[in-house]
Amino acid sequence: MGGAVEEKDGAGSSGRLESLAGNTAVPDMRLELVPIPVSDVDRAKAFYQQAGFGNLHDTQVTATMRVVQLTPPGSSCAIVFGTGMGPITDMTPGSVKGIHLVVADMAATRAALTARGIELSDVDDMGGVLYSYFSDLDGNLWALQQWPAGYQP
């Protein structure tokens, strides 16, 4: 296996990795939906709406299949939970840990979430990168992350 070289196209899209051996580049793939295992769909829906997630889609597909999608503010990636969705809903509630929500202003985000009744950890400063954590009612753990000023990830 050859090494990898990251090439950015001029359109500002994510980089494509190509092998030095000349393998075909893999087209862009967007992360659009992350499953969150919950024990009670309505309770989870209320929590995430309380946390400011929007763009709600709540569909009873069949008598046993319900799909709920919500999107964090400013994100193009949504979360999904529900019933009857096979391996997605077979995951253990509370087993997802460390999904990162990148924020521009940790203090403002914490203040807004606290005002909405969301409990957050104290802020951890890890070399200029700030973190604060919250969990949903099942224990799925979310990380708020703020990059240092001027950092371009």
Where are these regions (language model features)?
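Amphipathic alpha-helical segments
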Residues: 40-55
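Vicinal oxygen chelate
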Residues: 2-33, 54-137, 141-153
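Conserved beta-strand-loop-alpha-helix junction that forms the acyl-donor binding cleft
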Residues: 38-41, 63
